[in-house]
C-alpha cells in the first residue's frame, strides 16, 4: 500500500502569485516593495506595503518576510501576505 504525504511549502507559484497581486495593488495607487534575496542559501521574500502612495519618511503599513521553505511559520506568513494583497483588491 502506497501512502501519500502532503507537504505545504512556499513555492515559486506562490511567489509569482504574490508578484501578480502586488502589480494589481500598485495599479490601484498603493506602494508595494517586493524583493527576493538569498541570505542563508534559501530565498527570502520581502513584501512591504504603503497604503495610498509612497511618502518619504513614512513607515510601511504592512510588512511580510518569509523564506521559500516548508516551515509552517513561513507558509502562514505567505498566506497572510496573499490575503492582505487580495483584500486591497476588493
Briefly describe each language-model feature range.
Residues 44-51:
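Short polybasic amphipathic segments
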Residues 1-42, 54-90:
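Negatively charged, low-complexity tracts enriched in Asp/Glu with abundant Ser/Thr
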Amino acid at each position: 500500500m502506497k501512502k501519500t504525504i502532503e507537504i505545504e511549502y512556499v513555492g515559486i507559484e506562490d511567489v509569482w502569485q504574490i508578484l501578480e497581486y502586488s502589480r494589481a495593488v500598485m495599479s490601484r495607487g498603493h506602494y508595494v516593495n517586493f524583493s527576493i534575496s538569498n541570505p542563508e542559501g534559501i530565498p527570502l521574500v520581502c513584501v512591504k506595503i504603503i497604503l495610498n502612495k509612497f511618502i518619504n519618511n513614512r513607515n510601511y503599513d504592512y510588512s511580510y518576510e518569509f523564506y521559500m521553505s516548508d516551515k509552517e511559520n513561513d507558509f502562514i506568513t505567505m498566506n497572510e501576505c496573499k490575503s492582505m494583497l487580495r483584500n486591497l483588491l476588493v
